[in-house]
Curated annotation (Swiss-Prot):
CDD domains: ATP-synt_Fo_a_6. It is a multi-pass membrane protein. It comes from the Bacteria. The keyword rRNA processing does not apply. Belongs to the ATPase A chain family. GO terms for molecular function: proton-transporting ATP synthase activity, rotational mechanism. This is ATP synthase subunit a 1. GO terms for biological process: proton motive force-driven plasma membrane ATP synthesis. It comes from Pelobacter propionicus (strain DSM 2379 / NBRC 103807 / OttBd1). GO terms for cellular component: plasma membrane; proton-transporting ATP synthase complex.
Length: 229
C-alpha cells in the first residue's frame, strides 16, 4: 500500500539505489524515525534522574513498571531477564501503530516486512532461550509425551512452531493495514470529522495489537523455558 501523502516521502528517492518499492521505502523511513524517537525519548527521560520522579521520568517509570509487572504476572520472577526484549518489541509496535493516526505519517506495522521482522526476532529468541536453558534436551519439546508417537509429534510440533511467526506477522499486518486503508478512504471522501471515530478506534486497536504481540512473545518464551514431559 502506497500512502497518498507522507512527510518523509523524499526517502523514496534516497532509497532508490536499493530498488525498494515505494511502500517498502516508506516503512524503512518511518521505522528509522520511530527508533530515533524512542531513543530520544529515553534519553530525555533518563538524563537527569531524581529520587522523586517527575515529568518524562515519571511517565517512563510508569511504562517500564507496567511492562515489568505484566512480565512477572505472566512468566513469573524468572521472566525478568527477558524484559528488554519484550519491552523493546512492545514499545516499537505500539509507537508504530499510533504514529499512523497522525496525518502525513505511515505506520511501519502496516507493511508486512516490518511485522515479519518483529515476528522472526521473537521466533529466533524463543528457540535461543530454549536451547540455552535445556541444551540438547530442548528437542523433547517437539517429541510429545509418548515415545512411539515422537516422529509424528515432532512433525506436528515443527509445523506449530513455524506457524507462530506467520500468525504474529499476519495478525498485526492485517489489522494495521486494514485500518490504514479505511482511514485513507474516509479522508478521501470527507476529510473533516467523519474519520474521527475511526481514528479513536485506531487508538484502541493500536494498544490491543501491541498488547497481544507482547503477550504472545511472553507465552512463547515461557513455553520454551518449561520442562518437557
Amino acid at each position: 500500500m502506497v500512502h497518498p501523502l507522507l512527510f518523509l516521502e523524499f526517502f523514496r528517492k534516497l532509497l532508490e539505489p536499493l530498488h525498494m518499492s515505494e511502500a517498502g521505502a516508506d516503512a524503512v523511513a518511518y521505522t528509522w524515525l520511530i527508533m530515533l524517537l524512542l531513543l530520544l525519548f529515553s534519553f530525555l527521560a533518563t538524563r537527569a534522574l531524581k529520587m522523586i520522579p517527575c515529568g518524562l521520568q515519571n511517565f517512563m517509570e510508569v511504562v517500564v513498571g507496567g511492562v515489568e509487572n505484566m512480565i512477572v504476572e505472566t512468566m513469573g520472577e524468572h521472566g525478568r531477564p527477558y524484559f528488554p526484549l519484550v519491552a523493546t518489541v512492545g514499545l516499537f509496535v505500539l509507537v508504530s501503530n499510533l504514529i499512523g493516526l497522525i496525518p502525513g505519517f505511515f505506520p511501519p506495522t502496516a507493511n508486512i516486512n516490518t511485522t515479519a521482522a518483529c515476528a522472526i526476532v521473537v521466533f529466533i529468541a524463543t528457540h535461543v532461550v530454549g536451547i540455552k536453558r535445556h541444551g540438547i534436551g530442548y528437542i523433547k519439546h517437539f517429541c510429545g509425551p509418548i515415545l512411539w508417537l515422537a516422529p509424528v509429534m515432532f512433525f506436528i510440533e515443527v509445523i506449530g512452531h513455524l506457524s507462530r511467526p506467520l500468525s504474529l506477522t499476519l495478525r498485526l499486518f492485517g489489522n494495521m493495514n486494514g485500518h490504514e486503508l479505511v482511514l485513507i478512504i474516509f479522508f478521501g471522501l470527507a476529510p473533516f470529522l467523519v474519520p474521527l471515530p475511526m481514528m479513536l478506534m485506531g487508538v484502541l486497536v493500536s494498544f490491543i495489537q501491541a498488547f497481544v504481540f507482547m503477550l504472545l512473545t511472553m507465552i512463547y518464551i515461557q513455553g520454551s523455558l518449561e520442562e518437557a514431559h
